[in-house]
């Protein structure tokens, strides 16, 4: 089904801190749009002061992390065709910032905690003399972690960090 010309309703969190509330928007969709395209169009046409963090629009930087209909996703990689299909007919698409992190404004959160925790992790220094082998299987196993783009969606979905008031103690 083509989305071109479809009018879609959105609810986007606007404001700062506790005073933030969902604001309603309607937008005409184009074929091939991603959620970030919609946010940019709302920003350009209706809300020029809307705060949103993004950088590459290619799924490489992780800056545009948000919750779309309650699911943590990258806005630049989430196709509107998928979101429209998942959203019950007549319901708006809801876009909120990540819940785990302190809310700054609109769709922007403070993710500095992640970097602070990383700084507290002591480096592992191996023995002076290399008396071990690093085989290809081990290299393949750790490669997955090198692919991290620091979008922090994994941290956002962790129920311990998300729901525990003292989540800093777990780091």
Show where each model-derived region lies.
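Signature of N-terminal electron-transfer/Fe-S-associated modules in redox systems
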Residues: 1-171
């Amino acid at each position: 089904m083509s989305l071109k010309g479809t009018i879609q309703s959105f609810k986007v969190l606007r404001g700062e801190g506790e005073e933030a509330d969902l604001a309603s928007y309607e937008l005409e969709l184009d074929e091939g749009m991603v959620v970030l395209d919609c946010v940019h169009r709302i920003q350009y046409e209706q809300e020029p002061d809307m705060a949103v963090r993004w950088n590459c629009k290619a799924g490489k930087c992780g800056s545009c992390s948000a919750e779309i209909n309650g699911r943590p996703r990258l806005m630049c990689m989430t196709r509107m065709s998928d979101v429209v299909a998942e959203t019950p007919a007549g319901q708006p698409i809801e876009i909120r910032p990540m819940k785990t992190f302190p809310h700054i404004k609109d769709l922007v959160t403070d993710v500095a905690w992640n970097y602070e925790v990383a700084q507290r992790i002591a480096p592992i220094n191996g023995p002076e003399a290399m008396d071990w082998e690093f085989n290809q299987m081990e290299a393949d196993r750790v490669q997955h972690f090198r692919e991290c783009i620091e979008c922090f969606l994994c941290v956002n979905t962790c129920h311990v960090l998300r729901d525990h008031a003292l989540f800093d103690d777990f780091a």
